[in-house]
Amino acid sequence: VVKNTVGGNGTFNFTSNITGLNNFDLTTVGNTAATAAVPVPTGTYSLAEVIPSTYSLTGLSCTGGQTSVQSPSVSITVGKGDNVVCTYTNTRNTATLTVIKNTVGGNATFNFTSNTALGDFALTTVGGTKSTVATTIPTGTYDITETATAGWSLTNLVCTGTNAPVYAGGKVTINAATSQNIVCTYTNT
């Protein structure tokens, strides 16, 4: 069994009725992983991947033997001398994130911390606004926090394009789901 990933490494669970490979995990490093070859008697076997919510199965193919693919499962009939290789490819689910900073009554630089692909960043308003570029992020839970800036008060924080953001002062926790276009707007006066 070969496991390939696009967009990041992960751990993937498989089930089968193949002796020596009943329930197993493959963890990709450099976007690939594989089991060792396992000798099996002739017969029919099943193999299936338990697809994590953060990935989509984007490819499944087998070579050797007789296989019937019904994604994410495979029925494999192994004959004498067959060498069967099944390759599963998963692509990391992503969303996009944009942070907008609006100011009323002037311009300033505002610092943010985040555990997103943006990392820690600063936005300096010009004409009362500034934003990050739309950034692709893997699906998951993230925090974005605006650090208090002297002379400015946070008067509004709203995130759209995501379900149930949690606000706590200048911090928002978002749950980025597949294909969401999340926009968080911080307004200071």
Question: For each of these PLM feature ranges, what is it?
Answer:
Residues 1-189:
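Solvent-exposed loop/turn and edge beta-strand elements of beta-rich ligand-binding domains
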